[in-house]
């Protein structure tokens, strides 16, 4: 809505990047629809970031380090399956093989990583989400990732010991606030 757009406009003036708000009239549907709302504004590589995730900014550099596959994307993943900041019942799980994603979803088995919510993408992600909607009725971002994974166009990279938190509960909000204070203290 308007208050969020004003906040983003204010923030954009303080950052060395361009931020464009894309209105998603289908916000109540799958999160892939929010990605598709940005399609008219994108003609090159772009990030998809989860708004409720706090993450070490270095993860952006990690995910951009290698060239993107043509028409593909890359997801920063956490291989630390014992990460205490992860809500195992809610996290999106990832099955990787080398630097490729094989499968993704909240309910998959055989996973060996967690989705951090930090993506580096080509416009091929838009096509993959559209294909997922058309072929499977799945309008989630994960549906698009599965389409790219099936075509071996969905890469991944490990974040190592970098911090990320999906802020979905009051306890995780407290943890995120503590992490921000700690980071600010270290920066000073």
Please describe what each predicted stretch is:
Residues 44-45, 71, 152:
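Short coil/turn segments at beta-strand junctions that form active-site/ligand-binding loops
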Residues 49-51:
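Active-site acidic Asp-centered loop
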Residues 6, 56-135:
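Conserved core of the sugar-phosphate nucleotidyltransferase
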Residues 1-47, 186:
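Conserved N-terminal catalytic core of the sugar/cofactor nucleotidyltransferase
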Residues 3-7, 31, 58-59, 128, ...:
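Phosphate- and divalent-cation-binding pockets in alpha/beta enzyme and binding domains
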Residues 97, 110-188:
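Conserved alpha/beta core of the MobA/IspD/sugar-nucleotide pyrophosphorylase nucleotidyltransferase superfamily
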Residues 18-20, 100, 153-155:
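Conserved beta-strand segments of alpha/beta enzyme cores
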Residues 26-30, 81-83, 163-165:
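A short acidic, often aromatic-flanked loop/helix-cap motif at beta-alpha or helix-coil junctions
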